[in-house]
Every structure is written in structure tokens, then in C-alpha cells.
Amino acid sequence: MPNSLHGKTIAILATDGFEQSELMKPKQALEEAGAKTQVVSPTEKKIKGWDHKDWGKEVAVDIALKSADPAQYDALLLPGGVMNPDQLRMNPDAVRFVKHFFEQAKPVAAICHGPWMLVEAGAVRGRTMTSWPSLKTDIRNAGGSWADEEVIVSNGVVTSRNPDDIPAFNREMIALFSKAAAAGNGKPVQKVA
């Protein structure tokens, strides 16, 4: 992948129970494309991943959510895992953090259960998305359309279903984030009302 994200900083919002591959592989792809990534979490030191059916590895938190300024980031990555977004969506600071990216027309990528945060942030209406199948009703009830596809890009948001989709997810995430970077984040995303 070309280094089209050089000089850009991407927030990765996660907490304990994130799906290991859905954080680590996109993080690596972003860094290979030239971006600086920062893991942002309500937990201050380390968060523990979930690796398919058991606990995975710990990942260092770069900045605590309470200290993170979303204005300092060019884009947002929301990994899945059932526990991770389920906890984050109940955290008002995490929801505000996500809303900022839509209010400021910045691109967002969410995989698997990650789109739960988009539902909570009121950012689904008018978009077509994919996700882990159990989120289909939540997305539709929030005003979005849901499709069972490997990856969907809709109005500044990239979504995918599961870890098997990571290669396509990474490709489209890098393409969207690069396009936004080239445009100076010039309104690629619909603002949240």
C-alpha cells in the first residue's frame, strides 16, 4: 500500500474484549500506509484482546479517553469484539468521541460489532452498512440499510462483517482515509444532526 497517510493520525477506540485481529491487522495496515495510530481507551494502561474464543494479548493504550482530544485525529477505527463496543456504547465520553468524527466530517471505519458505536452515536441513518449479522436489526432500527457483504463504503464510513473480511476492510479503509487526507478532510462524511 502506498504511504498515502503520511502525517495523518488515526484514533483506534477500544477497550477490553476487542477482537484481536480486528485491531492489530488494521492498525498495521494504517501504519504501513504511513499513518500514526493511537489506541484510545477508557482504560489507561493496557487493554486485553479477545482472540476468537478466548482471551488474547494485551495492547498498550496510547492515551486515555478522558485525555484524548478527537480534534487531533484525522480518522477513526472501531474494531469489533462483542465486549468491546458493548462497553464503549454505555460510556458517554466514548459516544461523544465518536460523534465528533461525524460532526467534523472525518472518515470512520468499523468492523464486526464496531458499528454498534455508530448506532449509539446516531450516525447510521441514510447509510448502507454491514456488520456481524446480529447487528442487522439495530442498524435498520437506527435508520440505516444493512447488507451481507464483505465490505461496504457508504458516505464516509467503511464497514465489514468479521475477521475474514479484514483484507477487503483494510483496502477500503486505506482508500477512504487517503481520499479524505488528499481532500483535507473536505466534507467526505455526512454530518450528524
Predicted regions and their residues:
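Extended, subdomain-level signal for the structured scaffold at the beginning of enzyme domains
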Residues: 1-104, 108, 116-128, 136-193
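Catalytic nucleophile serine of serine hydrolases
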Residues: 112
